[in-house]
Amino acid sequence: MTASPDPAQRIDALRRRIEDANYRYHVLDEPQMADADYDKLMRELEALERAHPELASADSPTQRVGHLAASRFAEVRHAMPMLSLGNAFSDEEVTEFVRRISERLEVRQPLFSAEPKLDGLAISLRYENGEFVQGATRGDGATGEDVSANLRTVKAIPLRLRGEGWPRVLEVRGEVYMPRAAFEAYNAQMRAQGGKILANPRNGAAGSLRQLDARITAQRPLSFFAYGVGEVSEGALPQAHSAILAQLRAWGFPVSALVEVVQGSDGLLAYYQRIGEARDGLAFDIDGVVYKLDDLAGQREMGFVSRAPRWAIAHKFPAQEQSTTVEAIEIQIGRTGAATPVARLKPVHVAGVIVTNATLHNADQIARLDVRVGDTVIVRRAGDVIPEVAAVVADQRPPGTQAWQMPTQCPVCGSEIVREEGQAVWRCSGELTCPAQRKEAFRHFVSRRAMDVDGLGEKFIEVLVDSGLVKGVADLYLLSVDQLLQLRLISTADSPHAFLREAREHLASGAYAQLEASVVGIGVDLAGERDVPQTWQADLLRAGLPSFDWNRKKIATKWAENLIEAIEISRDTTLERFLFALGIEHVGESTAKALSAWFGDLELIRHLPWPLFKRVPDIGGEVARSLGHFFDQAGNQKAIDHLLARKVRIGDTHPPSPKLRGELSLANLLEDLEIPKVTPIRAAQIATAFGSIDALRNGGPEPLVEAGVPQSVAESLAAWLLVPANDTLAVNAQRKLSELLAMLPEAGEEKTGPLDGQTVVITGTLAALTRDAAKQRLEALGAKVAGSVSKKTAFLVAGEEAGSKLDKAQSLGVEIWDEARLLAFLGDHGQQP
């Protein structure tokens, strides 16, 4: 009989998988987990956390809505979070939802507002005094993207409210979508013009709102339905959800004609049946229906769980499915070496999209389904969006198929593929010697939220890595314009002959002869077009061509000069960005920000024993160990040294947070070391009795027992300390703990920032630094950087092309700073741009 998995380990595994799925779905726009699997994992995690409240954690996916906003637009902090909804997949779950509300409110047959669940992009529209002032995407629920300019192009969205009686501030929540007929007409037009067609209406809507050029958005046939409200200030709304929707309609917002008020579970299920039967004939895509308690007083009584309201639920439709054939199973290697199996499929049309690939998640999933090359499989776009292999049609399996096995070697670098004990994920052990991991590491390092190297695209990163010019991320800072020009000529040429013809135009004769000799050196017959190896580009790059001074009068150089300038600009960064850019496993933006806020100094962080990281809120054992493992690797420390040697500068270094004083103690250290049987109570008891790690090291269990520690705990601690690695860790951790305490100010000496408690708004374009960088530096000085101007705004920083925010600030008498004043202020307070 197999023992049940340890709840703590299972909870940790579930949190990792769900957070990874959140990141891929919300940030990368590369979903690799089916909605059905995601929902199943989330429900299992919720059940385990209810059963084991002692294992609850603030960084659990159950405590949040999603992940981070995408990075191309300014951030907007939602005044009221845009929460997600719980899901129901069966009649029984809907009935249970109604029962809970009935019992809590003591209402036998509560009324609900029922409405279709549109498959588009959720947004929040902010109106002040009846005028549209800002629009934002949902993002992670707390912070979204400012897409106001794009939303202004959507004709269904009123720029000024009709009628009268609206609140001074009104946030309207709704869905931007693309009607089916408009989607088909748009694609027909694009085909006729040879333009790019859209994959499906949902992607069309989401992609349109993320266009940096609002003129492109204006050409897309977008529409909008309102379904609720967010912040409401200085005004009143009706006390029923259905009445609020009617009021919104009167003020000029489109509201779906399919919204109905129904009673009890029978009414909800009947509505679900009707909408399901009408689904294919609707003018827009939906993936379910939404039920909301109609009475607002009842909504307030029911309240919320951390990530969803208790008074609303989404009843999802079954996913759409088709059968096809598995033509191959391949391995993709990610940034951290994760080896993810992917099914290559015979193309099949599923829910409006041609599917050729589907994730198989991991080796355990393949074994569970017994997926084999040649199998007929059921492909599902769960949630009508994400392709997955749902099942194998076993009776159609051809003879002679073989059960799939995880390769023992990385398909890219040949290193061993290994699986850590207790982990579902297999990983390439090659680390940064693996080109695939190196390329992913570079992509992450230069990304917008990391070092923000503008203009370095994925394809050119591949060329850089394949050429051998960049072996580590620090090598980016050694590149020259001439090297970039040479790489571009090689990578874009159709043949070595074409490359040489182009090169002859831009090189002196002596340099050209040297280049030609290098090409001949890889075995290319230049007498004709025959015998050209297919790998000539990679061979030529690996051969290490000499670098030439190219005639820049005859060759386009602006792109290369801009890229070198972007690399130079990225040298000046923040600790938060630098840590995130390193690509440490499990360390996302929020963790990097917390590390920066609590420790403040890279030199401190990179030499900190891993147990001390657990003193930072929301950093648990897994993340702390991951940090420790990363900084324990000599290669990683060498990479950091190279970056610093190449003039990468962290501009916001500061002393550790005074809040650490309340966290740093021997009792907490003994707990954080994760010694078997040493509970928090026992850790406090041992710390009180012995006072230091040194006092515990060589005495064995007897002194512990004499101090009242139970025999089993004493033996466990003594045995743990006998392991040399554990002993070294404990000693180093206490030494560093003492050093940290000595660095902290005494009580009452804590320094405050010059902008503590002040709200600042940034608008327009800044020349010397990005708005993100300005925001981070202002926050480092204590400011809260908001997305909209109010009477509480301390000052507004106005860059070039400042718009309505500047007008509003002037009308309210808010102090206005230009960029020069901002830069001077930052410089005076140690925040050089």
Swiss-Prot record:
Name of the molecule in the record: DNA ligase
Keywords, in A-Z order: DNA damage, DNA repair, DNA replication, Ligase, Magnesium, Manganese, Metal-binding, NAD, Zinc
Function: DNA ligase that catalyzes the formation of phosphodiester linkages between 5'-phosphoryl and 3'-hydroxyl groups in double-stranded DNA using NAD as a coenzyme and as the energy source for the reaction. It is essential for DNA replication and repair of damaged DNA.
Gene label: ligA
CDD domains: BRCT_DNA_ligase_like, LIGANc
Protein residues bound to NAD(+): D35, A36, D37, Y38, D39, S84, L85, E115, R138, E175, K292, K316
Positions with a binding annotation for Zn(2+): C410, C413, C428, C434
Entry's Gene Ontology cellular component terms: cytosol
Highest taxon listed in the record's lineage: Bacteria
Active site feature: K117 (n6-amp-lysine intermediate)
Organismal lineage: Bacteria, Pseudomonadati, Pseudomonadota, Gammaproteobacteria, Lysobacterales
NCBIfam families: dnlj, PRK07956.1
Record InterPro entries: BRCT_dom (IPR001357), BRCT_dom_sf (IPR036420), DisA/LigA_HHH (IPR041663), DNA_ligase (IPR001679), DNA_ligase_AS (IPR018239), DNAligase_adenylation (IPR013839), DNAligase_N (IPR013840), NA-bd_OB-fold (IPR012340)
EC assignment: 6.5.1.2
Listed cofactors: Mg(2+); Mn(2+)
Domain BRCT: 750-833
GO biological process terms on file: DNA repair; DNA replication
Family in the record: Belongs to the NAD-dependent DNA ligase family. LigA subfamily.
UniProt cross-references to HAMAP family, sorted A to Z: DNA_ligase_A
EC primary class: ligase
Pfam families: BRCT, DNA_ligase_aden, DNA_ligase_OB, DNA_ligase_ZBD, HHH_2, Nlig-Ia
GO-annotated molecular function: DNA ligase (NAD+) activity; metal ion binding
PROSITE patterns in alphabetical order: BRCT (PS50172), DNA_LIGASE_N1 (PS01055)
Reactions accelerated catalytically: NAD(+) + (deoxyribonucleotide)n-3'-hydroxyl + 5'-phospho-(deoxyribonucleotide)m = (deoxyribonucleotide)n+m + AMP + beta-nicotinamide D-nucleotide
